[in-house]
């Protein structure tokens, strides 16, 4: 089984749960977030339509199997161009 590389990107999307032990010390548990946890980090001021678009994009990103940095960059750029075109035409 292939182990995930520790990159700034993977570190930035790790979700940190802080728990308190009986003696007051803090422990941190790192886990890969699902799309709902990722969306919880977005500001709550976006419209429902914008929020739906963001959720769809995150679900598509999470569905990619073992993406390389190059393929991710290409995928994101294509999605961004498509999204930008739609924004200008609306």
UniProtKB/Swiss-Prot annotation:
Entry keyword set: Apoptosis, Host cytoplasm, Host membrane, Host mitochondrion, Host mitochondrion inner membrane, Host nucleus, Host-virus interaction, Inhibition of host innate immune response by virus, Inhibition of host MAVS by virus, Inhibition of host RLR pathway by virus, Membrane, Modulation of host cell apoptosis by virus, Viral immunoevasion
GO CC terms in record: host cell cytosol; host cell mitochondrial inner membrane; host cell nucleus; membrane
Superkingdom of origin organism: Viruses
Stored InterPro entries: Flu_proapoptotic_PB1-F2
Region Mitochondrial targeting sequence, residue ranges: 65-87
Residue numbers marked as site, Low pathogenicity: 66
Region (Disordered) location: 1-30
One Pfam family from the record: PB1-F2
Subcellular location: Host mitochondrion inner membrane; Host nucleus; Host cytoplasm, Host cytosol
Any one GO BP annotation for this protein: symbiont-mediated perturbation of host apoptosis
Compositionally skewed regions (Polar residues) per UniProt: 1-28
The keyword Membrane belongs to this UniProt entry's keyword annotation: yes
Recorded family membership: Belongs to the influenza viruses PB1-F2 family.
Role summary: Plays an important role in promoting lung pathology in both primary viral infection and secondary bacterial infection. Promotes alteration of mitochondrial morphology, dissipation of mitochondrial membrane potential, and cell death. Alternatively, inhibits the production of interferon in the infected cell at the level of host mitochondrial antiviral signaling MAVS. Its level of expression differs greatly depending on which cell type is infected, in a manner that is independent of the levels of expression of other viral proteins. Monocytic cells are more affected than epithelial cells.
SUBUNIT field: Oligomer. Interacts with human SLC25A6/ANT3 and VDAC1. Interacts with host MAVS.
Misc: Is not encoded in all strains, and seems to be dispensable for replication.
Record-given protein name: Protein PB1-F2
Species in which this protein is naturally found: Influenza A virus (strain A/Silky Chicken/Hong Kong/YU100/2002 H5N1 genotype X3)
Lineage, top ranks: Viruses, Riboviria, Orthornavirae, Negarnaviricota, Polyploviricotina
